[in-house]
Structure formats: C-alpha cells, structure tokens
C-alpha cells in the first residue's frame, strides 16, 4: 500500500516469493511504472487509488523525489533533512478503504502480509482495514520517530496500537535519517501476529 513503482514487489520476486501480490498506488505517473512492472506477472494485481479510513476524493502532494509524496502536509524537519522531498504539485486522487473491497481482491487468501508505506498516512489506512488486519499474519509499516508530516501518529503511539491488535514486533529497519546529524527519523517496523 503506497507501492510507488513496485520496488517492494520486485524485491519479493527476487528473493523467491511466488504468491499473490496486490499493490495500490494513487499517483498516476508512479502507477504507470507500477503497471508496466507488474503486467508480465499474472499473480500481481495493481490498483490506481489510495487507501484510507474513508471513501472519498482528495488531493495528494507530489514530491520532487516521488517517494515522499503524501496526502498530509510535510514538516520542516523532513524538508531540511531531504531537500528533494519538497512538494512540487498536487494531484486529485480517489481514496477507498481496504475493507470495502477485501472480498473482491483477497477472498480466499491465507497468510496475508500487509505492507503500508504512505508517508504519515499509515494509521488512516489501518483504520480502514480493521477486518483485513484481523486476518493478517504480518504487518510492515513505515513509522516516524519524529514528526515528518502534519497530524501523523508517531512510533511510540503507533507501537501501542499495533500491540493491541495482537501483533508483536519482530524487526526494525532504519529507512530515513538526518544526513548531517545522523538522527534517525523514520523506520520500517515488521510485526507478526502473536500465537
């Protein structure tokens, strides 16, 4: 969720994963690349919309580097740490909830692993995916240690919410740091369902 041009899906195939992949990317230019990447793979479906807690139309801020694009406004700490993350334009997008069409896309799936990288919007995605999260065995979420986007949930609060959903932390990967100070700003956290 927040697939960009399909980097994560490509990596899954490189390490030997042969199962279904379902990717969501709302930005048209990134979606075109994602669609091109996935079209030779019969087990990889792609959708051109965002996921959130409500079904709605909104605008997304497009960043110069594409990877930092977000529905939310960016904080100065982020921009100062990565000047190419600055917003250069806005694009109208559709937002749906994952639960609103989960039957359509993953009706008979087992061992569901959900990866969410939506630049501060991860909590909203989870709210709209409550039913599917209950079925999932794993979650991978980008989380900010310090505020990178307006009104986003930070790691310490997010961690508690994920634990209440019966998941436990398995791994953390540093994904974004201030290049001058080395201060860690964002991580990818991997959680698996408790037995």
Would you name each region that the model predicts?
Residues 1-195:
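Phosphate/nucleotide-binding beta-alpha loop and adjacent structural elements of enzyme active sites
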């Amino acid at each position: 969720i927040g697939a960009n041009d399909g980097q994560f899906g490509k990596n899954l195939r490189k390490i030997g994963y042969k199962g279904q992949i379902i990717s969501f990317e709302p930005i048209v230019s990134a979606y075109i690349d994602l669609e091109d990447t996935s079209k030779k793979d019969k087990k990889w479906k792609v959708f051109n919309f965002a996921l959130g807690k409500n079904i709605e139309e909104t605008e997304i801020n497009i960043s110069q580097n594409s990877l930092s694009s977000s529905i939310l406004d960016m904080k100065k700490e982020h921009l100062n740490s990565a000047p190419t993350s600055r917003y250069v334009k806005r694009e109208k997008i559709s937002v749906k909830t994952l639960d609103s069409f989960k039957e359509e896309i993953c009706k008979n799936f087992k061992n569901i692993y959900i990866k969410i990288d939506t630049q501060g919007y991860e909590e909203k995605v989870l709210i709209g995916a409550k039913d599917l999260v209950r079925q999932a065995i794993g979650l991978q979420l980008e989380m900010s240690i310090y505020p990178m986007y307006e009104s986003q949930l930070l790691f310490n609060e997010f961690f508690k919410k994920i634990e209440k959903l019966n998941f436990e932390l398995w791994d953390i990967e540093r994904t974004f740091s201030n290049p001058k100070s080395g201060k860690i700003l964002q991580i990818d956290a991997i959680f698996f369902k408790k037995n």
